[in-house]
Amino acid sequence: VVLGKKGDTVELACNASQKKSTQFHWKNSKQIKILGNQGSFLTKGSSKLSDRADSRKSLWDQGCFSMIIKNLKIEDSETYICEVENKKEEVELLVFGLTANSDTHLLEGQSLTLTLESPPGSSPSVKCRSPRGKNIQGGRTLSVPQLERQDSGTWTCTVSQDQKTVEFKIDIVVLAFQKASSTVYKKEGEQVEFSFPLAFTLEELTGSGELWWQAERASSSKSWITFDLKNKEVSVKRVTQDPKLQMGKKLPLHLTLPQALPQYAGSGNLTLALEAKTEKLHQEVNLVVMRATQFQENLTCEVWGPTSPKLTLSLRLENKKATVSKQAKAVWVLNPEAGMWQCLLSDSGQALLESNIKVVPTWPTPVQPMALIVLGGVAGLLLFTGLGIFFCVRCRH
């Protein structure tokens, strides 16, 4: 038994006992001649394989009279007979085909179905291994639900029949962004860079996209930017005036926000609709903004944007332990000491964002000499007026 792959080439062996050229014939199960020889010439019969069958003439003088069948078809599955030296050798050929149900370019979350084509009467089994090492077994139909971006690559599938095996390689491309979600941490006023790299590469990439943004302070989301993608080049269609984003013209998709401000802190969803695909690619992006301020006798550290309840916000004087540290979005210190203070946002001891602010010492305001002169003059005038009134009243009495 020899197993072959649909569309591939197979070689059926036939050897003579002596290493010399002799007459041979290959026939199918209906005794119809496929090919043979006449001296040193290759002859062909009237079978359906006449245009796809061949033999290695260079090996005839070694007693090797194999038949090569190109572009195999499922219907080529049958028993073939080699007649040489007054003897017959039978070889059973079974041809299998393994194909994806619709397309080998699938969006993340979609299902992959592999269908096995097999000759009548066979009972093969299929075992496939994904690029991330996951094994899937099945019969004539093999289904893989909820594809992940790690499933992109070459799938190796082994078809087994009668203790023989044949291996298939199928390239699957999972259309997705490299990350499902990302968070950018910035101090107030800093420039913000958003990047959306794709987890796949294609020769031609055409589609359109949009970034919707839900600011933490806003009651509803709004579209920040829309764009087109053609031959891996990006062109902006529409962009808001506040904020006015800038977008790179080449892949990977790249957005720049001039300043990180509290009113922009929030979550966004970038969608990318590819040509000939009904569903869209998605990536979530978050922006967390930090502000450290001093007002009168109060030093405050605040963050805006989506943060985990487990994150810790702290304020500490340089080279000292934290004065205040808690799982909150705002902390403050009353009457802070003079020096450089650090506002720190951390996750399990790992710093995510920090901002430094210098607290200047406050001194009592000195009394100016001119103020003393004015106060003295006013006091003298009041005293003089009071004495005058006193003596006038006394004289009248």
UniProtKB/Swiss-Prot annotation:
Statement: the UniProt record of this protein carries the keyword Phosphoprotein = no
List the GO molecular function terms: coreceptor activity; MHC class II protein complex binding
Record note on modification: Palmitoylation and association with LCK contribute to the enrichment of CD4 in lipid rafts. Phosphorylated by PKC; phosphorylation plays an important role for CD4 internalization.
Cytoplasmic-side stretches of the chain, per the record, are: 392-397
Between which residues do disulfide bridges form? C14-C82, C128-C157, C301-C343
| Keyword Methyltransferase on entry | no
Q: Name one GO cellular component term.
A: plasma membrane
All copies of the Ig-like C2-type domain together span 99-176, 177-290, 291-347
Alphabetic keyword roster: Adaptive immunity, Cell membrane, Disulfide bond, Glycoprotein, Immunity, Immunoglobulin domain, Lipoprotein, Membrane, Palmitate, Repeat, Transmembrane, Transmembrane helix
Q: Which GO terms describe its biological process?
A: adaptive immune response; cell adhesion; T cell differentiation; T cell selection
Q: Which residues are glycosylated?
A: N15, N269, N298
Q: Which residues form a coiled coil?
A: none
Q: State the CDD domains in the record.
A: IgV_3_CD4
- Where does the record place the S-palmitoyl cysteine lipid attachment? C392, C395
UniProt-annotated location(s)? Cell membrane
Q: Where are the transmembrane segments?
A: 370-391
- Name the InterPro entries on file: CD4, CD4-extracel, Ig-like_dom, Ig-like_dom_sf, Ig-like_fold, Ig_C2-set, Ig_sub, Ig_sub2
Looking at the record, the residues that make up the Ig-like V-type domain are 1-98
Per the record, membrane topology reads: Single-pass type I membrane protein
Subunit annotation: Forms disulfide-linked homodimers at the cell surface. Interacts with LCK. Interacts with PTK2/FAK1. Binds to P4HB/PDI. Interacts with IL16; this interaction induces a CD4-dependent signaling in lymphocytes. Interacts (via Ig-like V-type domain) with MHCII alpha chain (via alpha-2 domain) and beta chain (via beta-2 domain); this interaction increases the affinity of TCR for peptide-MHCII. CD4 oligomerization via Ig-like C2-type 2 and 3 domains appears to be required for stable binding to MHCII and adhesion between T cells and APCs.
Function of this protein? Integral membrane glycoprotein that plays an essential role in the immune response and serves multiple functions in responses against both external and internal offenses. In T-cells, functions primarily as a coreceptor for MHC class II molecule:peptide complex. The antigens presented by class II peptides are derived from extracellular proteins while class I peptides are derived from cytosolic proteins. Interacts simultaneously with the T-cell receptor (TCR) and the MHC class II presented by antigen presenting cells (APCs).
Q: What is known of its domains?
A: The Ig-like V-type domain mediates the interaction with MHCII.
Q: What is this protein called?
A: T-cell surface glycoprotein CD4
Annotated organism of origin:
Cercocebus atys (Sooty mangabey)
